[in-house]
């Protein structure tokens, strides 16, 4: 996320943190090889919510009605990899208290096994968010959620390539709300599911201690 626009919307660059991406110039005295893919993050205009966002995982309330979806997700390596078999896309909103995400993930067999918070959620199929409020690749946030509504939230002091000990795994997002809805049955291989969806509300206060300008959309 690059910056907030103070009026009724914020313009967000969806920053995908790529470990295959690197700078062609020296970075703090280190040299990195040329990246395999062009670094050009897609952008999304995130509007202020006009109605109350009801957090139940279903994405069918009035607040989301006219909110555009992002483009369908692709592999982290872009055109170097084939398109995913199943569609994933997201909507976003904000109000005075929260930054909202609504994700829809196609999956014919919705499956999840991890139930303990801060376990390695990506061993299940999951939805992940990376937030870097000031765009400097340091002091950024990661959140992962699986279809059982299990959360894994982390705080990164710096990029992985800077140091071995860069993650605060014990850190939790205060006031985080996540709600999942499964259109089908979870962990049942005998039938075909349609998708699962997740609604997430991240309080703006989460960013206060690490966001330099303390400028929020309101």
Segments and roles (model prediction):
Residues 5-15:
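Sec-dependent signal peptide recognition
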Residues 14-24:
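Hydrophobic h-region of N-terminal signal peptides that target proteins for export
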Residues 25-218:
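Structural preference for beta-rich elements and adjacent junctions enriched in aromatics
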């Amino acid at each position: 996320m690059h910056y907030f626009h103070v009026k009724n919307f914020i313009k967000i660059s969806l920053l995908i943190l790529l470990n295959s991406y690197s700078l062609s110039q020296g970075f703090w005295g280190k040299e990195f090889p040329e990246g395999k893919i062009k670094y050009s993050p897609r952008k999304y205009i995130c509007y202020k919510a006009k109605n109350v966002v009801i957090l139940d995982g279903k994405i069918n309330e009035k607040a989301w009605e006219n909110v555009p979806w992002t483009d369908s997700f692709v592999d982290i390596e872009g055109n170097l990899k084939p398109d995913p078999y199943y569609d994933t896309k997201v909507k976003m909103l904000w109000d005075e208290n929260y930054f909202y995400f609504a994700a829809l993930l196609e999956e014919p067999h919705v499956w999840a096994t991890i139930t303990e918070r801060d376990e390695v959620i990506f061993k299940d199929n999951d939805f992940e968010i990376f937030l870097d409020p000031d765009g400097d690749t340091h002091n950024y946030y990661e959140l992962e959620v699986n279809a059982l509504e299990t959360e894994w939230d982390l705080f990164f002091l710096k990029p992985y390539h800077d140091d071995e000990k860069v993650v605060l795994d014990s850190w939790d997002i205060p006031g985080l709300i996540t709600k999942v809805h499964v259109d089908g049955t979870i962990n049942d291989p005998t039938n075909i599911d349609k998708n699962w969806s997740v609604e997430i509300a991240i309080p703006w206060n989460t960013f206060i201690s690490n966001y330099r300008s303390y400028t929020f959309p309101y």
